[in-house]
Amino acid sequence: VMIIFFCWLFKIEKTNVYQILGVIFSLFGVVVIITKADLGILLNLNFNKGDLWMVVAMFSWAIYSALLRKKKFDLSHISFLQTIITAGLIFLLPAYLIEIALGYRLNIHIPFILTLSYVVLFPGLASFFFWIKGISIIGSNRSGIFLHMMPIFSTLMAILIFKEKFMTYHFIGAMLIIVGIVLSSKGRRV
């Protein structure tokens, strides 16, 4: 939703009625899965400081994704990713130095190295590379809707790994998300 808003605000991409309907359907599907189709859960939400940070992260990601489509400089996807990683390391360096000054040390062992390798390779590098590539091919608006697939994949992983039961609300939410994605991929821009 926020990616479409910032694309509209910055005049980066035009949207269409199908995309708006698709976002509504898929967002409703996400809410169905997260709340287990229980309106009481939605009505009794309590917020804390961490939720505010998540809102900041959501806005940052939406602005990044919208502006990614607009980038006019001549960098390959790999070079652009390297630039983002370098900037991130520069911003994180002061926090790392403070931790060292306070006496915190990493306990490096094989499970730590394996976990760190996984996090660096897949969520850290591959996901960003494919996100940049996807936006360059189909645009920010159409790419953003695919973020709504996360609850579907989380459900599937919970079923496979933790033996969670597949419930009716999982099916309804997944169908709404899929309908939303299909809708958002149709139609001409207005």
Predicted segments with their positions:
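Hydrophobic residues within alpha-helical transmembrane segments
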Residues: 20-25, 52, 56, 83-90, ...
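Juxtamembrane helix-loop-helix junctions in multi-pass membrane proteins
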Residues: 63-88
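Hydrophobic/aromatic residues within transmembrane alpha-helices
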Residues: 9-11, 15, 71, 80, ...
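Hydrophobic alpha-helical transmembrane segments of multi-pass membrane transport proteins
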Residues: 5-6, 31-32, 52-67, 93-142, ...
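Helix-boundary and loop/linker segments of multi-pass membrane transporters
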Residues: 40-47, 103-109
